[in-house]
Amino acid sequence: MPGGPGLLQALCATTFLLFLISAGGLGPGSQALWVDGGPPSMTVSLGETARLQCLHNRSRLSSKLNITWWRVLQGNATWPDIFLSYGKGPNGELTIDTVNKSHMGMYRCQVEEKDLNQKILSSQQSCGTYLRVRERLPRPFLDMGEGTKNNIITAEGIILLFCAVVPGTLLLFRKRWQNMKFGVDAQDDYEDENLYEGLNLDDCSMYEDISRGLQGTYQDVGSLHIGDGDVQLEKP
Protein backbone atom coordinates (compact mmCIF):
# COMPACT_ATOMS: atom_id res chain seq x y z
CA MET A 1 0.00 0.00 0.00
CA PRO A 2 1.64 3.24 -1.08
CA GLY A 3 2.42 5.63 1.77
CA GLY A 4 0.94 3.23 4.29
CA PRO A 5 3.67 3.25 7.01
CA GLY A 6 4.21 7.00 6.72
CA LEU A 7 0.51 7.73 7.00
CA LEU A 8 0.19 5.50 10.04
CA GLN A 9 3.08 7.23 11.77
CA ALA A 10 1.56 10.64 11.03
CA LEU A 11 -1.79 9.59 12.52
CA CYS A 12 -0.08 8.29 15.68
CA ALA A 13 1.89 11.50 16.09
CA THR A 14 -1.25 13.63 15.63
CA THR A 15 -3.18 11.56 18.17
CA PHE A 16 -0.36 11.83 20.71
CA LEU A 17 -0.13 15.59 20.19
CA LEU A 18 -3.88 16.04 20.71
CA PHE A 19 -3.65 13.95 23.87
CA LEU A 20 -0.90 16.16 25.26
CA ILE A 21 -2.87 19.31 24.46
CA SER A 22 -6.00 18.02 26.11
CA ALA A 23 -4.06 16.85 29.16
CA GLY A 24 -2.44 20.24 29.53
CA GLY A 25 -5.81 21.99 29.18
CA LEU A 26 -7.40 19.88 31.92
CA GLY A 27 -4.51 20.14 34.33
CA PRO A 28 -4.47 22.16 37.58
CA GLY A 29 -5.13 25.83 37.10
CA SER A 30 -6.93 25.33 33.79
CA GLN A 31 -10.44 24.37 34.93
CA ALA A 32 -13.48 26.23 33.62
CA LEU A 33 -14.93 29.27 35.38
CA TRP A 34 -17.72 28.28 37.78
CA VAL A 35 -20.39 30.50 39.41
CA ASP A 36 -22.90 29.26 41.96
CA GLY A 37 -26.55 29.69 41.09
CA GLY A 38 -27.32 31.16 44.53
CA PRO A 39 -30.43 30.73 46.68
CA PRO A 40 -33.77 31.16 44.89
CA SER A 41 -34.98 33.76 47.39
CA MET A 42 -34.07 35.65 50.54
CA THR A 43 -36.42 37.25 53.08
CA VAL A 44 -35.46 40.20 55.28
CA SER A 45 -37.43 42.56 57.51
CA LEU A 46 -37.82 46.29 57.04
CA GLY A 47 -34.79 48.24 58.21
CA GLU A 48 -32.45 45.23 58.26
CA THR A 49 -29.34 44.64 56.13
CA ALA A 50 -29.45 42.23 53.17
CA ARG A 51 -26.25 40.42 52.11
CA LEU A 52 -26.11 38.52 48.83
CA GLN A 53 -23.06 36.39 47.99
CA CYS A 54 -21.69 35.38 44.61
CA LEU A 55 -19.78 32.14 45.11
CA HIS A 56 -17.39 31.36 42.26
CA ASN A 57 -14.18 29.56 41.28
CA ARG A 58 -11.68 30.97 38.80
CA SER A 59 -10.24 28.85 35.98
CA ARG A 60 -6.70 30.26 36.06
CA LEU A 61 -4.65 31.39 39.02
CA SER A 62 -3.11 34.26 37.07
CA SER A 63 -6.42 35.64 35.82
CA LYS A 64 -8.32 38.56 37.26
CA LEU A 65 -12.00 38.43 38.18
CA ASN A 66 -14.49 41.23 37.78
CA ILE A 67 -17.69 40.65 39.83
CA THR A 68 -20.71 42.87 39.24
CA TRP A 69 -24.25 42.84 40.58
CA TRP A 70 -27.30 43.53 38.45
CA ARG A 71 -31.00 43.95 39.17
CA VAL A 72 -33.43 42.23 36.84
CA LEU A 73 -36.44 44.38 36.01
CA GLN A 74 -39.80 42.67 36.24
CA GLY A 75 -42.51 42.83 33.61
CA ASN A 76 -40.51 42.94 30.36
CA ALA A 77 -37.77 40.50 29.39
CA THR A 78 -36.40 42.89 26.77
CA TRP A 79 -35.47 45.54 29.31
CA PRO A 80 -31.77 45.56 30.16
CA ASP A 81 -30.64 44.77 33.67
CA ILE A 82 -29.70 47.66 35.94
CA PHE A 83 -26.13 47.79 37.21
CA LEU A 84 -25.93 48.13 41.00
CA SER A 85 -22.33 47.81 42.21
CA TYR A 86 -19.22 45.69 42.22
CA GLY A 87 -18.95 42.68 44.46
CA LYS A 88 -16.86 43.07 47.60
CA GLY A 89 -14.69 40.57 49.37
CA PRO A 90 -13.61 37.10 48.25
CA ASN A 91 -17.24 36.03 47.70
CA GLY A 92 -18.27 39.14 45.77
CA GLU A 93 -20.85 40.18 48.37
CA LEU A 94 -23.58 42.72 47.72
CA THR A 95 -24.72 44.63 50.82
CA ILE A 96 -28.01 46.57 50.98
CA ASP A 97 -28.34 48.66 54.13
CA THR A 98 -31.71 49.62 55.65
CA VAL A 99 -33.89 47.56 53.35
CA ASN A 100 -37.29 48.95 52.34
CA LYS A 101 -40.11 47.92 50.03
CA SER A 102 -38.42 49.43 46.98
CA HIS A 103 -35.56 46.92 47.23
CA MET A 104 -37.82 43.97 46.41
CA GLY A 105 -36.81 42.25 43.17
CA MET A 106 -34.48 39.80 41.43
CA TYR A 107 -30.71 40.18 41.83
CA ARG A 108 -27.98 38.29 40.01
CA CYS A 109 -24.22 38.47 39.88
CA GLN A 110 -21.94 38.26 36.85
CA VAL A 111 -18.31 37.11 36.94
CA GLU A 112 -15.88 38.03 34.16
CA GLU A 113 -12.44 36.46 33.99
CA LYS A 114 -9.74 38.58 32.39
CA ASP A 115 -6.10 38.02 31.61
CA LEU A 116 -3.24 40.40 32.28
CA ASN A 117 -4.13 42.40 29.16
CA GLN A 118 -7.73 42.93 30.42
CA LYS A 119 -9.02 40.58 27.78
CA ILE A 120 -12.19 38.73 28.78
CA LEU A 121 -11.47 35.02 28.80
CA SER A 122 -14.83 33.78 30.06
CA SER A 123 -17.99 35.06 31.69
CA GLN A 124 -20.62 33.39 33.88
CA GLN A 125 -23.64 34.62 35.83
CA SER A 126 -25.80 33.29 38.63
CA CYS A 127 -29.41 32.19 38.26
CA GLY A 128 -30.60 35.06 40.45
CA THR A 129 -31.99 35.55 43.95
CA TYR A 130 -35.34 37.19 44.63
CA LEU A 131 -35.22 39.55 47.60
CA ARG A 132 -38.43 39.68 49.65
CA VAL A 133 -39.08 42.40 52.22
CA ARG A 134 -41.62 41.85 55.01
CA GLU A 135 -42.94 43.94 57.85
CA ARG A 136 -40.95 43.84 61.06
CA LEU A 137 -42.38 41.35 63.54
CA PRO A 138 -43.86 42.96 66.68
CA ARG A 139 -41.61 42.67 69.68
CA PRO A 140 -43.18 40.81 72.60
CA PHE A 141 -43.86 42.67 75.83
CA LEU A 142 -41.67 40.28 77.82
CA ASP A 143 -38.72 39.47 75.59
CA MET A 144 -37.24 36.55 77.48
CA GLY A 145 -36.50 32.88 77.01
CA GLU A 146 -38.82 29.98 77.75
CA GLY A 147 -36.69 28.87 80.70
CA THR A 148 -37.00 32.27 82.36
CA LYS A 149 -40.77 32.29 81.82
CA ASN A 150 -41.11 28.84 83.41
CA ASN A 151 -39.09 29.97 86.44
CA ILE A 152 -41.31 33.03 86.88
CA ILE A 153 -44.49 30.91 86.69
CA THR A 154 -43.09 28.48 89.27
CA ALA A 155 -42.20 31.34 91.63
CA GLU A 156 -45.70 32.83 91.26
CA GLY A 157 -47.26 29.48 92.14
CA ILE A 158 -45.14 29.17 95.28
CA ILE A 159 -46.02 32.72 96.38
CA LEU A 160 -49.76 32.13 95.84
CA LEU A 161 -49.60 28.88 97.81
CA PHE A 162 -47.77 30.65 100.63
CA CYS A 163 -50.33 33.47 100.71
CA ALA A 164 -53.22 30.99 100.84
CA VAL A 165 -51.88 28.51 103.41
CA VAL A 166 -50.01 30.67 105.93
CA PRO A 167 -52.85 33.12 106.87
CA GLY A 168 -55.33 30.25 107.31
CA THR A 169 -52.90 28.31 109.48
CA LEU A 170 -52.26 31.37 111.66
CA LEU A 171 -55.99 31.91 112.16
CA LEU A 172 -56.47 28.29 113.22
CA PHE A 173 -53.64 28.48 115.76
CA ARG A 174 -54.97 31.80 117.08
CA LYS A 175 -58.45 30.36 117.60
CA ARG A 176 -57.02 27.33 119.33
CA TRP A 177 -54.90 29.52 121.60
CA GLN A 178 -57.93 31.63 122.55
CA ASN A 179 -59.94 28.53 123.42
CA MET A 180 -57.14 27.20 125.57
CA LYS A 181 -56.66 30.54 127.35
CA PHE A 182 -60.26 31.56 128.10
CA GLY A 183 -61.82 28.11 128.40
CA VAL A 184 -65.55 27.42 128.42
CA ASP A 185 -66.57 30.58 130.37
CA ALA A 186 -65.88 32.76 127.44
CA GLN A 187 -68.16 30.59 125.36
CA ASP A 188 -70.96 30.80 128.04
CA ASP A 189 -70.69 34.57 128.20
CA TYR A 190 -70.96 34.67 124.48
CA GLU A 191 -74.08 32.53 124.61
CA ASP A 192 -75.62 34.78 127.33
CA GLU A 193 -75.08 37.77 125.15
CA ASN A 194 -77.06 36.12 122.40
CA LEU A 195 -79.81 34.80 124.70
CA TYR A 196 -82.37 37.37 123.60
CA GLU A 197 -81.35 37.28 120.02
CA GLY A 198 -84.39 37.08 117.76
CA LEU A 199 -86.83 38.63 120.27
CA ASN A 200 -89.18 41.15 118.66
CA LEU A 201 -88.95 44.48 120.48
CA ASP A 202 -92.31 45.65 119.12
CA ASP A 203 -94.08 42.72 120.78
CA CYS A 204 -92.34 43.49 124.10
CA SER A 205 -93.53 47.10 124.03
CA MET A 206 -97.09 45.98 123.32
CA TYR A 207 -97.17 43.71 126.36
CA GLU A 208 -95.67 46.44 128.47
CA ASP A 209 -98.43 48.87 127.45
CA ILE A 210 -101.14 46.34 128.31
CA SER A 211 -99.70 45.72 131.79
CA ARG A 212 -99.48 49.40 132.50
CA GLY A 213 -103.07 49.89 131.45
CA LEU A 214 -104.31 47.18 133.78
CA GLN A 215 -102.47 48.65 136.74
CA GLY A 216 -104.38 51.92 136.38
CA THR A 217 -107.84 50.29 137.01
CA TYR A 218 -107.08 49.08 140.53
CA GLN A 219 -106.88 51.18 143.74
CA ASP A 220 -104.70 50.76 146.77
CA VAL A 221 -106.90 50.23 149.83
CA GLY A 222 -104.22 51.32 152.23
CA SER A 223 -103.75 54.70 150.62
CA LEU A 224 -107.44 55.36 150.09
CA HIS A 225 -109.04 58.00 152.37
CA ILE A 226 -112.67 57.15 153.07
CA GLY A 227 -114.71 60.18 154.15
CA ASP A 228 -118.39 59.58 154.49
CA GLY A 229 -118.32 55.87 153.81
CA ASP A 230 -120.18 56.01 150.52
CA VAL A 231 -117.10 55.01 148.55
CA GLN A 232 -117.41 51.65 146.87
CA LEU A 233 -114.40 49.58 145.92
CA GLU A 234 -114.31 47.72 142.66
CA LYS A 235 -113.80 44.03 142.92
CA PRO A 236 -111.05 42.63 140.77
From Swiss-Prot:
Q: What's the name of the protein?
A: B-cell antigen receptor complex-associated protein alpha chain
Q: Which loops or segments lie on the Cytoplasmic side of the membrane, by the record?
A: 173-236
Which residues are annotated as site, described as Required for binding to BLNK?
A: 218
| Entry PTM | Phosphorylated on tyrosine, serine and threonine residues upon B-cell activation. Phosphorylation of tyrosine residues by Src-family kinases, including LYN, is an early and essential feature of the BCR signaling cascade. The phosphorylated tyrosines serve as docking sites for SH2-domain containing kinases, leading to their activation which in turn leads to phosphorylation of downstream targets. Phosphorylation of serine and threonine residues may prevent subsequent tyrosine phosphorylation. Arginine methylation in the ITAM domain may interfere with the binding of SYK. It promotes signals leading to B-cell differentiation.
Residues on the membrane's Extracellular side span 33-151
- List this protein's GO terms for biological process: adaptive immune response; B cell differentiation; B cell receptor signaling pathway
- Give the matching InterPro entries: Ig-like_dom (IPR007110), Ig-like_dom_sf (IPR036179), Ig-like_fold (IPR013783), Ig_sub (IPR003599), Immunoglobulin_dom (IPR013151), Phos_immunorcpt_sig_ITAM (IPR003110)
Disulphide bonds annotated for this chain are 54-109
Keyword vocabulary terms for this entry: Adaptive immunity, Cell membrane, Disulfide bond, Glycoprotein, Immunity, Immunoglobulin domain, Membrane, Methylation, Phosphoprotein, Receptor, Signal, Transmembrane, Transmembrane helix
The answer to whether the entry has keyword Transmembrane is yes
* Boundaries of every ITAM domain copy: 185-213
Residues annotated as domain Ig-like C2-type: 33-122
The record's function comment reads: Required in cooperation with CD79B for initiation of the signal transduction cascade activated by binding of antigen to the B-cell antigen receptor complex (BCR) which leads to internalization of the complex, trafficking to late endosomes and antigen presentation. Also required for BCR surface expression and for efficient differentiation of pro- and pre-B-cells. Stimulates SYK autophosphorylation and activation. Binds to BLNK, bringing BLNK into proximity with SYK and allowing SYK to phosphorylate BLNK. Also interacts with and increases activity of some Src-family tyrosine kinases.
- What note about domains is in the entry? The transmembrane helices of CD79A and CD79B chains and two IgM heavy chains assembly in a four-helix bundle structure that appears to be conserved among different BCR isotypes.
Entries under PANTHER family matching the protein: B-CELL ANTIGEN RECEPTOR COMPLEX-ASSOCIATED PROTEIN (PTHR14334), B-CELL ANTIGEN RECEPTOR COMPLEX-ASSOCIATED PROTEIN ALPHA CHAIN (PTHR14334:SF1)
Q: How does the protein's chain sit in the membrane according to the entry?
A: Single-pass type I membrane protein
Question: Where on this protein are sugars attached?
Answer: 66, 76
How does this polypeptide assemble, per the annotation? Heterodimer of alpha and beta chains; disulfide-linked. Part of the B-cell antigen receptor complex where the alpha/beta chain heterodimer is non-covalently associated with an antigen-specific membrane-bound surface immunoglobulin of two heavy chains and two light chains. Interacts through its phosphorylated ITAM domain with the SH2 domains of SYK which stimulates SYK autophosphorylation and activation.
What are the GO cellular component annotations? B cell receptor complex; external side of plasma membrane; IgM B cell receptor complex
Q: Which gene encodes it?
A: CD79A
